[in-house]
Amino acid sequence: MSNAEIPIIDIAALTGSDQAAPQGLDQIAEKMHTACTGTGFFYVANHGISKDLVAEVFEANRRFHASPLEDKMRVKRNAWHRGYTPLASSTLKSSARFDSARLPNLLESISIRNELSPDDPVYKKVPLQGPNEWPDVPGFRATVERYVAAVTALGVKLLEPV
């Protein structure tokens, strides 16, 4: 599938963006339904997340991944699957046809999820709810938290037409 085949849905009507002619909620809902039942996913235009914030989170991640392995291992993935996963340290069983995965993933990542306070009523009801592992990279946590807040707000907005 090429990029040209992935639907682009303009959500300016949801975000208040004036960069494009706004579509009504019904039109957005129809396009989302068509995309989700067709290709299974879509690009979002006029989402309202600033290019500066996107650049900042990419830069924060670049700085983390440029850190020495010893530093990254201090925030290795914990029991709640949050934190650093070193390159080739995991395998993914992608099909029931195989007894086990044969090759390690060529993946290096840091997993950060929404963090709830232990006294939040949802805390014990949500699987894998626990603390994030935050690296000691200046500005990393603040930048990632701002980005997570922005994409969470976007996710809530995307539910409006549904």
List the predicted regions and their residue ranges.
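Peripheral, non-catalytic segments flanking oxidoreductase cores
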Residues: 1-161
